[in-house]
C-alpha cells in the first residue's frame, strides 16, 4: 500500500524511498514484529477467557507435557495478523504473486482455526477429520497453484529446476500443478507435525522465511539471477516483503512462545506458515531447495511415515514415539535440549540450502 506513495516522488522527493524493496522489506519485518508485540498480550488474554482449559494434551505423550495443561492455543492468530497487516502495508499490491501467496496463507490459517476450534470444543486432540482437512488443503493448493502458473511466463511457469546444476530444468507441463499442490500441502503438514514443543517450529520457520526472503529478492532481480544462473521470475521480489513479514511476526510470537510457552500457535499458525513457505518456493522455482532448507520439517514428517508404516507392516515401532522430537524426549532429553539442538540442525540446513545459489 505504501509503495504507491512513491508515485508522488515528483511532489515529495523523500517518498522515493518507498520504491526500494529492501526498505519495504525491513519495514515489513518491523511492522509485523510490532503488531505481535502490541496485540499479543491482548490476544493471549482473550484466548484464555474463551478456551478455559486450553489445548488438550495427549495422554500418551511425555509426562513433562502434562504441565502445559491450560496453555491457550490458536496463537497463530497474532502471527497471521502481523503478516497480513505488514504485507498489505508494505508490498506492491499490484503483483498477483503477493495475493496468491497471502490468500493461500490465510486460507490455510482458516483450516487450522477450524481444526483448533473443534479440538477445544470436543476436548480431544483430533479436531477436523484428516480427510476433510486434506481435501480443503488440496483444493486451496490447486487454486493457488493454477493462479501462480497463469501469472508465469511461458514454459517457465511449469518448469522444475534442480539445485547444484546450471540451467537444468524440466518442463512438467500441466503435471506441474499437482506437484505444486503437493509442495504446498506437504510443507503445511510438515510444519504442523514439527509444532510439538515450545518454540520448536517457529524458529525453523523464521530461518526458512529468512532464506526465502533472500531467494525471492534474488529471483526477482534480473541482474542477480543472471549472475547466479538461477531462474528470473519477474514480480517475485515482492515476496521478500511477505517473507520479511513472516520473520517479524515469528520473532514477535517467539516472545510469548519461548519456554515455558504462554501460548501455542496451534494449527492456525502451523498450517498457515507451512503453506506460506511452500507457496513461496513454488513461485520462486526453488521447491527442492525448500526441502533442504526445511529439512528439519522433512525429517519430522518422515519419522511419522516410517513409524506408521513399520507398525502396520511388522507390528513394531522404529521410534519410541513420533514425530521425531518426541522420540528424543522419551529417551530422556530435556525439552529445551531437543528444541535448541533442532534449531541448530535448522540453521545448518539453511546454510546448505543457501549454498545451492552459488554452487553450480
Curated annotation (Swiss-Prot):
Membrane topology designation: Multi-pass membrane protein
Top-level taxon of the source organism: Bacteria
Family: Belongs to the glycosyltransferase 4 family. MraY subfamily.
Biological process, per Gene Ontology: cell division; cell wall organization; peptidoglycan biosynthetic process; regulation of cell shape
Entry EC number(s): 2.7.8.13
The protein's annotated pathway: Cell wall biogenesis; peptidoglycan biosynthesis
Taxonomy of the source species: Bacteria, Pseudomonadati, Pseudomonadota, Alphaproteobacteria, Rhodospirillales
Gene that encodes the chain: mraY
Designated name of the protein: Phospho-N-acetylmuramoyl-pentapeptide-transferase
Amino acid at each position: 500500500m505504501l509503495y504507491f506513495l512513491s508515485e508522488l516522488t515528483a511532489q515529495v522527493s523523500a517518498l522515493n524511498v518507498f520504491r526500494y524493496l529492501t526498505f519495504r522489506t525491513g519495514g515489513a519485518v518491523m511492522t509485523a514484529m510490532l503488531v505481535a508485540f502490541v496485540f499479543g498480550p491482548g490476544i493471549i488474554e482473550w484466548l484464555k477467557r474463551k478456551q478455559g482449559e486450553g489445548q488438550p494434551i495427549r495422554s500418551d505423550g511425555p509426562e513433562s507435557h502434562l504441565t502445559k495443561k491450560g496453555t491457550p492455543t490458536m496463537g497463530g492468530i497474532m502471527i497471521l495478523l502481523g503478516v497480513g497487516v505488514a504485507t498489505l502495508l508494505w508490498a506492491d499490491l499490484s503483483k498477483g504473486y503477493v495475493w496468491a501467496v497471502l490468500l493461500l496463507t490465510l486460507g490455510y490459517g482458516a483450516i487450522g482455526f477450524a481444526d483448533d476450534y473443534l479440538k477445544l470444543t470436543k476436548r480431544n486432540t483430533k479436531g477436523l477429520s484428516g480427510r476433510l482437512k486434506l481435501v480443503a488443503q488440496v483444493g486451496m493448493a490447486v487454486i493457488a497453484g493454477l493462479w501462480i502458473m497463469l501469472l508465469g511466463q511461458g514454459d517457465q511457469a511449469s518448469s522444475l529446476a534442480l539445485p547444484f546444476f546450471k540451467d537444468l530444468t524440466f518442463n512438467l507441463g500441466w503435471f506441474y500443478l499437482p506437484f505444486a499442490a503437493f509442495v504446498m500441502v506437504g510443507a503445511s503438514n510438515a510444519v504442523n507435525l514439527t509444532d510439538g514443543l515450545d518454540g520448536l517450529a517457529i524458529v525453523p520457520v523464521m530461518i526458512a522465511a529468512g532464506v526465502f526472503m533472500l531467494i525471492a529478492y534474488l529471483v526477482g532481480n534480473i541482474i542477480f539471477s543472471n549472475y547466479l544462473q538461477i531462474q528470473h521470475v519477474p514480480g517475485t521480489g515482492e515476496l521478500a516483503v511477505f517473507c520479511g513479514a513472516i520473520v517479524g511476526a515469528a520473532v514477535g510470537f517467539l516472545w510469548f512462545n519461548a519456554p515455558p510457552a504462554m501460548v501455542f500457535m496451534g494449527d492456525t499458525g502451523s498450517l498457515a506458515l507451512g503453506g506460506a513457505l511452500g507457496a513461496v518456493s513454488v513461485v520462486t522455482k526453488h521447491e527442492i531447495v525448500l526441502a533442504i532448507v526445511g529439512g528439519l520439517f522433512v525429517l519430522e514428517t518422515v519419522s511419522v511415515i516410517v513409524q506408521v508404516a513399520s507398525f502396520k507392516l511388522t507390528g513394531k515401532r522404529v521410534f519410541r514415539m513420533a514425530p521425531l522430537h518426541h522420540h528424543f524426549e522419551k529417551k530422556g532429553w530435556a525439552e529445551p535440549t531437543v528444541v535448541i539442538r533442532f534449531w541448530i540442525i535448522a540453521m545448518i540446513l539453511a546454510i546448505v540450502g543457501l549454498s545451492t545459489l552459488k554452487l553450480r
